[in-house]
Curated annotation (Swiss-Prot):
It comes from the Eukaryota. The modification Phosphoserine is found at S104. One of its GO terms (molecular function) is metal ion binding. The modification N6-acetyllysine is found at K23, K138, K144. Keywords: Acetylation, LIM domain, Metal-binding, Phosphoprotein, Repeat, Zinc. One of its GO terms (cellular component) is cell cortex. This is Cysteine-rich protein 2. Residues 5-57, 126-178 form the LIM zinc-binding domain. Interacts with TGFB1I1.
């Protein structure tokens, strides 16, 4: 059964039929609702089920601020090349970042070189004689480098071995008798804050 044209409400036969907006129209009834310009199926805008030409009628009636499209129920069609600038934006960002990475790379080289020069700098100074300590004559104790003959008891001047002596206020002392006499309470070999803890001599227990 033939349908009726929504424009003239008359029967639409196959030979004169065009379909648009989900309806069958007479070919010459498919016109712009405002200017009566004959439209082509799918080549027009729509509002509330009625056809309108894209320009100027639909834009004038329903388009916000002169834009060609807009309003509820309108067909979506191509915009006049507004999205082209968005493509160029992201491309420029990686170029800047790569340049920043290149510039930030070189400064790290000299920092490593300077740290090496500190290790190969001048020898440390002996805390006893305040002279340079070279590798061949160096012994390390109390976190410092000493000349081997300079590592001796602060009281009796006995030559000491690294790690085999007591300490008080950063100065080396022999365990017995000097440290015990100076800082040990009641004749005990060790004592006082800052001293090393070491084993007592078995002979000390025999003596009264």
């Amino acid at each position: 059964m033939a349908s009726k044209c929504p424009k003239c409400d008359k029967t639409v036969y196959f030979a004169e039929k065009v379909s648009s907006l989900g309806k069958d129209w007479h070919k010459f009834c498919l016109k712009c609702e405002r200017c009566n310009k004959t439209l082509t199926p799918g080549g027009h805008a729509e509002h509330d089920g009625k056809p309108f030409c894209h320009k100027p009628c639909y834009a004038t009636l329903f388009g916000p601020k002169g834009v060609n499209i807009g309003g509820a129920g309108s067909y979506i069609y191509e915009k006049p090349q507004t999205e082209a600038p968005q493509v160029t934006g992201p491309i420029e960002v990686p170029v800047v970042r790569t340049e920043e990475r290149k510039t930030s790379g070189p400064p790290k080289g000299p920092s490593k070189a300077s740290s090496v020069t500190t290790f190969t700098g001048e020898p440390n100074m002996c805390p006893r004689c305040n002279k340079r300590v070279y590798f061949a004559e160096k012994v390390t104790s109390l976190g410092k480098d000493w000349h081997r003959p300079c590592l001796r008891c602060e009281r009796c001047s006995k030559t000491l071995t690294p790690g085999g002596h007591a300490e008080h206020d950063g100065q080396p002392y022999c365990h017995k008798p000097c440290y015990g006499i100076l800082f040990g309470p009641k004749g005990v070999n060790t004592g006082a804050v800052g001293s090393y803890i070491y084993d007592k001599d078995p002979e000390g227990t025999v003596q009264p």
